[in-house]
Amino acid sequence: MSTSADDEQYTGLILLSGVDKPGIAASLFEVLSPFSITIVDIEQVVVKDRLILTVLIALNPAHESAIAADLESCAVSLDVDIATLFSYEEKSALSTKSNLIHVLISAKKLTPKALSQMAASISQNGANIERVTRLASNPLTIIEFVLSGATKETLTQSLSPIAISNSAEITVQ
């Protein structure tokens, strides 16, 4: 099935990683500001002073090489790594997902085994993990999974026994 140009948007996915320090986001957006682009999505996480920043932009395809060159210079000046992926996307794929489910997992000691079992159960129920965030670490570790593609009831039924067997608690919202 082909799509018309009206159904597609040219995008650039920017993935920046490196040691976190003040001013990285400001510098990145300063480099992008001369171009006629729109920020479609953005996520940032810092774990143990390591930064991962992803930005999805909508742009004119004619600007791709100039943006890529400016981002390479930015990476050198900031001493970070920047990878890019430019492609056409269906506009419908860029819209915000609805009906997301939030699963909170809390435990005094959260193990890889527990997360492996929960992630497998989530997948087996047809859900996709959209985002994972640590909300707290002391005295309990609390992790939030944001999921798409399943029902609250199904997830509650499948995750509850796993949580109990791993001395954890879950809340599905």
Predicted regions located by residue number:
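A conserved regulatory-domain signal marking ACT and ACT-like small-molecule sensing domains
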Residues: S2-Q173
